[in-house]
């Protein structure tokens, strides 16, 4: 396996200007050679059609694999221990598995995300949202109208508490889960900090699993524990990774969805008015948010199984590949006025939850959380408005997900 030519661009590990970066990269085409943290080269897929082609299921003749054994740099020893993205590629579970093993692992967790199970979670999510809004009201009254960070107080707590309820996370472990999930997405922190927080997260997951073995409940973790060993793939190691993946996939990305939808509506008051008047659906807002502000950012990692041509680029066997879901959502070859937020547009196509074999299993849960949280927020606070110039609100750290570092707002008038 050989590595392709040196990268033309450096992928900013802080992710501070993701949209500007995408436009600079796109000048070189839909497939761009970049340098990841630590100097490791990779391709970034920016084109919608190229991403769909790359992510197609090809059981007999795959172009790419999730198996790190196909990465030339890793096999050659050029990836140091502690490299910040390594944890996205080496853990044994759904995220890194190829068919047919991926199907077995996906089927293990799938019962937690059936329409009936998701429907049963609806009242739990409604209560979580109502409680967060009450906490915000109390905090706002105590702060005498000062600026509130809606991301910290609402956008992120709703999904992490929902995931906690789904998995049965004990209260005493919730803080460790939160810090560990944050570390996985922050590509700007030091490797030592990332490893420490990630290690603490894995330890907390093991503790939770041990408790469920001793005293199972009515949650996803308990269901997985009860079926350990029923298939060769259903091992304790894979169970731990399935729990970790559920936390990772369901936490910050869903928080970013709520964050970006609020930001989009507050910066496009004409569309907010249309939603409030019932002229535009919350489903349309959510789909357009997922296209306009892809919440998954640059998702690592896939590896070329063989040499192939895509989007004018010559991919070599062993090359690493990231998919820019922000870039695919703003592909001008696919979307008219791609940079415009417009929930009335005719097409709702987006790759916000991926495509193909690894399409997000928890997508219906994420959509439900947003559909509960957004109308409840705007109904409770009809005077909600941004407290800073939108252009000065920074992005969240790292290039893996796409949200804001903070979402400063004035809550305005409260509706009882």
Where are these regions (language model features)?
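Cytochrome P450
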Residues: 1-416
